[in-house]
């Protein structure tokens, strides 16, 4: 095993193989324990895109909330799923299918187009130029602003979808989809999440679709694997301690090093990861 590979695996807590049922139970118990330790919290809020990660996370949240209601007799516990399109969502049918699979207590739709466009307009009025990439990050951050607003209105916590196959590369927006109160998928790679959805009886098309962040208007439906320069199979193999090609390993390690700043939020005077040896 490559030296850096061992370090990354240890940081991400990825197991070489999993029992899907055990990992489902582990995530549900984690979500329940957090509520028990924070009795002022009565809801979980999650943005639903229709992709694998939010579909799985949402299902786990609903299962945890239902168990909390049954165990405590407190019907105020709620899971709130939020669809957050920018204008018209290209894969809106997948998001609807994810909601149907999860059966959340509340299903909200908040269109972020107006606030995002307003933000771009007021910033560009100062003479600044907002690129398409920058605007994509504004979309991600606006979605999180909405989720925290809803959580604040419902004594809730915002749940994130971050997992090992994204975290290693920082494939998320700082203070956007990377912001959350807790992340029940942390420790899992992409294929492990897929195995858990299969175990839960999820519609096949929701975990077999090509993952895409879909933030940039100039690059609609850009697959994650194209953006990353490496396939999720290669990433999963690497995180599970298997051998991958030299090219794939170098790209994975390059992404890890380049995204280190996202795993130190904010950077403090005691951090030195950014200094070149």
Swiss-Prot record:
Pathway: Cofactor biosynthesis; NAD(+) biosynthesis; NAD(+) from deamido-NAD(+) (ammonia route): step 1/1
A GO BP annotation: NAD biosynthetic process
Residues the record lists as binding deamido-NAD(+): 141, 174, 181, 261-262
Binding site for ATP: 47-54, 161, 190, 212
Keyword tags: ATP-binding, Ligase, Magnesium, Metal-binding, NAD, Nucleotide-binding
Sequence similarity: Belongs to the NAD synthetase family.
Protein name: NH(3)-dependent NAD(+) synthetase
């Amino acid at each position: 095993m490559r030296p850096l590979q061992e370090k990354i695996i240890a940081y991400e807590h990825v197991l070489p193989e999993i029992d899907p049922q055990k990992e489902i139970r582990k995530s549900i118990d984690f979500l329940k324990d957090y509520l028990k330790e924070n009795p002022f919290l009565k809801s979980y809020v999650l943005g639903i895109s229709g992709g694998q990660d939010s579909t799985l996370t949402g299902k786990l949240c609903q299962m945890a909330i239902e168990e909390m209601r049954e165990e405590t007799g407190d019907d105020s516990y709620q899971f709130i799923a939020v669809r957050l399109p920018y204008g018209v969502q290209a894969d809106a049918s997948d998001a609807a299918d994810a909601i149907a699979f999860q059966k959340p207590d509340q299903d909200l739709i908040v269109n972020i187009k107006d606030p995002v466009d307003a933000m771009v307009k007021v910033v560009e009025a100062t003479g600044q130029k907002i690129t398409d990439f920058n605007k994509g990050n504004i979309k991600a951050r606006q979605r999180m602003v909405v989720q925290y607003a809803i959580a604040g209105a419902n004594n809730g916590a915002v749940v994130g979808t971050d997992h090992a196959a994204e975290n290693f590369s920082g494939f998320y927006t700082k203070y956007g989809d990377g912001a959350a109160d807790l992340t029940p998928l942390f420790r899992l790679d992409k294929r492990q999440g897929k195995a858990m959805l299969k175990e839960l009886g999820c519609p096949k098309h929701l975990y077999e679709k090509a993952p895409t962040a879909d933030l940039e208007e100039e690059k609609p439906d850009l697959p994650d694997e194209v953006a990353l320069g490496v396939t999720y199979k290669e990433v999963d193999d690497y995180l599970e301690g298997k051998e991958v090609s030299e090219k794939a390993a170098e790209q994975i390690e390059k992404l890890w090093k380049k995204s280190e700043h996202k795993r130190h939020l904010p950077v403090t005077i005691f951090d030195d990861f950014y200094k070149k040896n």
